[in-house]
Amino acid sequence: MAAAATMAAAARELVLRAGASDMEEEEGPLGAGSGLQEPLQLGELDITSDEFILDEVDVHIQANLEDELVKEALKTGVDLRHYSKQVELELQQIEQKSIRDYIQESENIASLHNQITACDAVLERMEQMLGAFQSDLSSISCEIRTLQEQSGAMNIRLRNRQAVRGKLGELVDGLVVPSALVTAILEAPVTEPRFLEQLQELDAKAAAVREQEARGTAACADVRGVLDRLRVKAVTKIREFILQKIYSFRKPMTNYQIPQTALLKYRFFYQFLLGNERATAKEVRDEYVETLSKIYLSYYRSYVGRLMKVQYEEVAEKDDLMGVEDTAKKGFFSKPSLRSRNTIFTLGTRGAVISPAELEAPILVPHTAQRGEQRYPFEALFRSQHYALLDNSCREYLFICEFFVVSGPAAHDLFHAVMGRTLSMTLKHLESYLADCYDAIAVFLCIHIVLRFRNIAAKRDVPALDRYWEQVLALLWPRFELILEMNVQSVRSTDPQRLGGLDTRPHYITRRYAEFSSALVSINQTIPNERTLQLLGQLQVEVENFVLRVAAEFSSRKEQLVFLINNYDMMLGVLMERAADDSKEVESFQQLLNARTQEFIEELLSPPFGGLVAFVKEAEALIERGQAERLRGEEARVTQLIRGFGSSWKASVESLSQDVMRSFTNFRNGTSIIQGALTQLIQLYHRFHRVLSQPQLRALPARAELINIHHLMVELKKHKPNF
């Protein structure tokens, strides 16, 4: 309906618009209207607003033109005026039909009205009923709130009564002394479990009574006397028991760890004394400290004394230094040496003492070693002594913390009260021994033993020995540095002319250094220390200078090089057995050995092939400077070199090989030198061939006498030594 009305209105406007256009066309420019059947009544026009009205009409028309029905009408070419009248007629018919339908349904509409009126009455009555019900619910809600308040008050009173009953029950239970407690404290032995249980109960009741007395509870006065008498009885029995255990430590041949373990089962006894009778607790603690302090001191003094009796009889003395010659101590009244001084500087199997298996091995038993006539170096005795000290100190510290209920500084103080005299005695003994000790390897091993024992103590969470380890290291490090300085000075002051006959074989002083340095380097690699590397660096510099001083005593350069190579090779070989390949010492001697080996090869090739070497170098220099024409004047010299090489090279190579094998003690090193010399000879001959291939010497008749280089290589391989 609405769409039809809209369409009708749009049609009317279009008809009016179309009519106006038709009039303009028929009238022409003069406005003649003879073509219209009926004049168009436009009414009075307001020419002042004509443009505004036309704009509105235009907008309205454009809007209606968008309607689908209008579009369809325009598309099919329908006469809009006729279509508008048709639509208007249809609207009138629809209106009349609607009126007839309304008249036919008038009775039903009246009946519906009556029903609505009846429903309104029913709803009004229901509203009244619901209002009454709401009023009743409000009164019930008030009653429920009242009951809730009463219930909450009753719950509060109940909880208060229960809390009071619980507090009173706890108070009464805490104050009442049961007969079982009295019987156990008075009659049961302290070792029975029920005595310990009732002692804990007594301690709890005494604490509860003290707390209630502080609050002013009058009932405490009724049980105070009973508790005091029971406390005195318990303290007396506990004191006698603990002191008896402490006195059992004093019996000869007693393993004091057994009574210590027994005391730990009753550690609550001391806690009871500490909380109820501090004077008795102090007495017990002082007695324990005094007893164990004497026991440890006596045990370690005896053990250290007996342990030193199984040390090697021969130890390093102040004259057993690296730079001291073997004949220095020999004299008419001197005692013959039972072992070589060189063993002082070798590690051998001594390094096993810091291995994990040996480090925590059982301690040495002196009387067993004496019966078996076994002897040990100082570091083994040091390890056994300090492992026993470490083990007992850790056990003692943990016992003190657990039994005497101490920790932190208090535990340290109590530990040093027990072990202080023993530790001081051990330090004095070590200081006395080091004053006359010249065995650097032993001292260095002792340093690493201490470093490892310190780590073990840290893992066991026993910091009480930290200060002792620092004191031991403060004794060992200066002595180690002093011994190294003495060895450095001995090498520095050694006069090669006083060492006897010269020999190109490795010198015993360099062998001592190699063994000594490799020993310290291998030990230091386990726990690196920069101070040790610095000291070894000083010693290495002095040994290198010493080797150069001894080499200078030889008259020929060849002998000097043989001596240097033999010593460098020996030191490098010994170092590589124990030290890492990339260590500073290994790299240094490797460079020295390579440099001297190359120089020796050149010195070795110089007598038989010196002329050839000189010519090749001169010719290559001329060619490089662009003066190759000067080679034409060297034809006679070249001819002599070709014929001389061809006639003597085999004998020269054979002599060279024999000379090398006689000069070097290390066959492998000699082999390497021979191979290097032959390789350099082949390279030299190859360079000689290249020089002769120059245009200036290419027509030389003697070139026909040249030995084929491949033939030379095959022949030289026959001289390669095999070992």
From Swiss-Prot:
Tissue specificity as recorded in UniProt: Ubiquitous.
GO biological process, one term: protein transport
Organism superkingdom: Eukaryota
Pfam families: Vps52_C, Vps52_CC
Keyword hit for DNA-binding: no
Coiled coil regions in record: 107-127, 194-215
MF terms (GO), sorted A to Z: syntaxin binding
GO cellular component, one term: Golgi apparatus
Localization of this protein: Golgi apparatus, trans-Golgi network membrane; Endosome membrane; Recycling endosome
Membrane topology of the entry: Peripheral membrane protein
InterPro entries: Vps52, Vps52_C, Vps52_CC
Modified residues (Phosphoserine): 355
Key words, A-Z: Acetylation, Coiled coil, Endosome, Golgi apparatus, Membrane, Phosphoprotein, Protein transport, Transport
Sites of N-acetylalanine modification: 2
Subunit structure: Component of the Golgi-associated retrograde protein (GARP) complex, also called VFT (VPS fifty-three) complex, composed of VPS51, VPS52, VPS53 and VPS54. Component of the endosome-associated retrograde protein (EARP) complex, composed of VPS51, VPS52, VPS53 and VPS50/Syndetin. The EARP complex interacts with EIPR1. EIPR1 interacts with GARP complex and mediates its recruitment to the trans-Golgi network. Interacts with RAB6A and STX10. Interacts with BLTP3B.
Stated role: Acts as a component of the GARP complex that is involved in retrograde transport from early and late endosomes to the trans-Golgi network (TGN). The GARP complex is required for the maintenance of the cycling of mannose 6-phosphate receptors between the TGN and endosomes, this cycling is necessary for proper lysosomal sorting of acid hydrolases such as CTSD. Acts as a component of the EARP complex that is involved in endocytic recycling. The EARP complex associates with Rab4-positive endosomes and promotes recycling of internalized transferrin receptor (TFRC) to the plasma membrane.
Family: Belongs to the VPS52 family.
Protein name (database record): Vacuolar protein sorting-associated protein 52 homolog
UniProt source species: Rattus norvegicus
Gene that encodes it: Vps52
